[in-house]
Amino acid sequence: MEQANEKEEEERHEEAAGEKESFEESKEKAAEMSRKEKRKAMKKLKRKQVRKEIAAKEREEAKAKLNDPAEQERLKAIEEEDARRREKELKDFEESERAWREAMEIKRKKEEEEEAKREEEERRWKDLEELRKLEASGNDECGEDEDGEYEYIEEGPPEIIFQGNEIILKKNKVRVPKKSVVQVDGHESSNAEFVLQISDRPTSNPLPPGSEASANYQNVSSAQQILESVAQEVPNFGTEQDKAHCPFHLKTGACRFGQRCSRVHFYPNKSCTLLMKNMYNGPGITWEQDEGLEYTDEEAELCYEEFYEDVHTEFLKYGELVNFKVCRNGSFHLKGNVYVHYRSLESAILAYQSINGRYFAGKQVNCEFVNISRWKVAICGEYMKSRLKTCSRGSACNFIHCFRNPGGDYEWADHDRPPPRFWIHKMTSLFGYSDEKHMEHESSGSLNDSISDLSTDSHRQPSRRSRSRDHDHANVGSTPSYRSRKYHGDTQDSTREDKLRRHAENCHDGDDSPSRDGSLEREMYKERRYAKDTLHRDSRWSEHSPGHRVGRKRIHGRYSDDDSADGDDYGRRGTGHKRKPRRGTDSGVQEQMDNEKDRKTHRSSRKHSREGSSADKEEGHEHDRVHTVSDKSHRERSKHRHERSSSRYSHEEDSTESRHHQHKESDKKRSVETSPVGYQSDKDRDRSKQRQRYKSDDPESDQSRKGKRQSEENSDRETHKERRHRHRKRRRTQNSDDQNPKESEEVEEEIERWRPV
């Protein structure tokens, strides 16, 4: 301490001495410098002196702080905090380093395990390759005897190996001794060899079509029995949870994977449903490109109606149908598929034998049996809810998107519902039997009417026209198609007027002309669906390919596109249901109706002639004689026309025509016909008008003239209708004759009164 103080004192003395020297020097300089320079030097010295003082003061304060105990404690605490922070950072670093080392160790172990597995797989693969080479070359160590005693079979599921962009399926094979095969002479030995041959085949789709496995398997049992047995064994059979069986093939009979599907497909040897793949290729199908823009919706619907008329009529020859559907999906496995569901298995087999291998529109038709019995499951539900418009899955939907059949045919089958009553009657008139299960649901009154109708229809003569045209006449109970609504407006207007007129007459006098069964659906399906008298097309069915030239009259005696006098094959082939002969003929019924009409006409004409003068009476007698001659000629013409129409119209048209005739009979009773049915010439027409012109001007004569005009219009309209509706029912005619016995007596009295003396 003393030495330090001495040093400080020495420094002070030196500084003081230095200051004195500098002061003296400054004075000397000041003496030499000017006033301004002196002032600057003084200021500089003062600033320097101030800085020195401040520095000295700071040094003293620092010494004081160092000597202060509180300050020393604060500095010590700061140092300790820094030490703790450095220690914590070091521990964190060591912990993270240890975790990283552990992770790297785990990763290294995994890589080693993968490498070991890869080496093991390569080693096993090499062993298998060596075994295959040894088997192929026959140079196995065990010799020929050992090779003949052992074989390699698959064990467990195959292993999937991913090598770059390749996927390799490796099957584990185990070497086992071969089973001893007992050689037996005959067919059993071939079956045993066949079982050994197919043992190594893939089991994903064991029954592809056309294979020998399918042929042998079909001989064992039917497909329905197999499905029932499998459905009992598998809990979720036919659903998405069932990974063994293809649900789409079970529901629709088609799968987009085809034979490459990993799930089992069932191919029955016989079934009630036939499938013709890609048969329809007309407009209306969903296309991948823009081909669909070339046709409008109306043109597509018209083309499908033509296809439906041709194909549906051909399939209906072989038996009653439950459903007829054509797919309009865009997927290849469903595009243009035609499904035909028969009610009986015999009809389906007959259709298969007749249609398979034939040509339609230049393309060979291939029929398949499919197990489709629930159409509600096969058809897309969302597509049905949208009324056959669209689906959220679009054209790639794996369920059926079907066309709407003309007239709404088979819409009830889409929901697995029974057919309506009118359809049962229609099928009864076609095939001679009815579905008793559906007829039980009818009421007792309608049931009696239907039974009486069936008894009458059962005696109809078989049709002699081609079934392809004859079926359209049987479709009287269906609603008009789009083509008849669009291209045959006149026919539609006339039928609409007749329906309105009959409805008004029924409202005024319902006792004389009641409806047949009073059902709404019968009223909806009263008119013709197809206008066959205005549109005739040739069928596109043929027995040979387009290049084969064959006449169109008869093709192998199986099917003819044109009409023939001998009838079609359906009448010769039959459906197993024979009809009884009729108790009466249509010509006799027609004569009775004409006689009734003549009596009414004579009564009305003589009633008007009684009101005239004697000259008018003579003229009326002359007109009556002319009218009698015209009536005879008219009866002859109607009889001849009936004989021709009996060969043109089928028996199924009679039931519907009788309902039309019922309204015509009521028209004849309510309106007195004062004019004859036909005139011999224009001169007779003028004479009758002149005779009516000179009658008395009383109100009764005016009313009679009005009634005459109305009856003329009704008779003209009925005559126009009778050209197409010539058949009458015997029981309807008998009822009309027996309804009012007093009326016949009045007619006889009028004849006796006005008979010339």
Swiss-Prot record:
Pfam families: RRM_1, zf-CCCH. SMART domains: RRM_1, ZnF_C3H1. GO terms for biological process: mRNA splicing, via spliceosome. One of its GO terms (cellular component) is U2AF complex. GO terms for molecular function: DNA binding; RNA binding; zinc ion binding. The keyword Zinc-finger applies. Residues 444-455 have a biased composition (Polar residues). Keywords: DNA-binding, Metal-binding, Repeat, RNA-binding, Zinc, Zinc-finger. A zinc finger (C3H1-type) spans 240-268, 374-404. This is Zinc finger CCCH domain-containing protein 5. It comes from Arabidopsis thaliana.
